Amino acid sequence: MLGEHNIKDYTLDALNSYISFVLQKNTLFTGTIRENMLWGNNNATDEEIYEALKKAEILPLIESYKDKLDHEVLIDGKNFSGGQKQRLTIARAFLKKAGILILDDSTSAVDKITEKNIQNAISTLSEHPITKIIISQRISSVKDCDNIIVLEDGKITAQGTHKDLIANSLLYQEIYNSQGGDYNEK
């Protein structure tokens, strides 16, 4: 089911327009930053693009370029670091305004402060109903989710909120402790 309709009732194009992906290994296209952002929403205004770039914590970099949104993106985004590419593809996903946002280790190449700011921006994507599916090895990326599924060897070993899993899942506790624990939970 997707909403109140059977997923089989949707065409592939309809599903593609409803779902946005941000993968750990992301894709930037040869062209300009603006052209790359328009892949998310070809009707987006410059104002909307700048807002998405701001939410994705990449706006200061873009504003540092003389040609701003018209800055050239080389093949495979080779003129950007891994973290910069991730933030640009996150901005593109924000522009799409999809009903389902799938983030697969999408902040793995950014520092913890940037990750936290992006997570805060993701949590405020409420202009329209949105389901967020976050796949991550970092607990800090998923700790605020309504439902967390813990996998080991491809099998579900635990499920619940962060608080539930800290109390009841040894594997989750081990991962949590190995990543430094706490995460400003005080």
Question: Which functions belong to the PLM regions below?
Answer:
Residues L95-G99:
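A short, proline-enriched helix->beta-strand linker immediately N-terminal to the Walker B motif
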Residues K55, S64, N120-P129, K143-K186:
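C-terminal portion of ABC ATPase nucleotide-binding domains
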Residues G3, L59-L88, S106, V110-I113, ...:
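ABC-fold ATPase nucleotide-binding domain signature/coupling loops
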Residues P129-I135:
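Conserved H-loop
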Residues S81-G82, L88-A93, N117, I134:
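ABC ATPase nucleotide-binding domain "signature" region
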Residues L101-D105:
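Catalytic Walker B motif of ABC-type/P-loop ATPase nucleotide-binding domains
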Residues M1, D9, N16, R34-I75, ...:
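ABC ATPase nucleotide-binding domain helical subdomain, centered on the C-loop/LSGGQ "ABC signature"
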Residues Y18-T27, N41, D76-G77, I139:
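ABC ATPase nucleotide-binding domain signature
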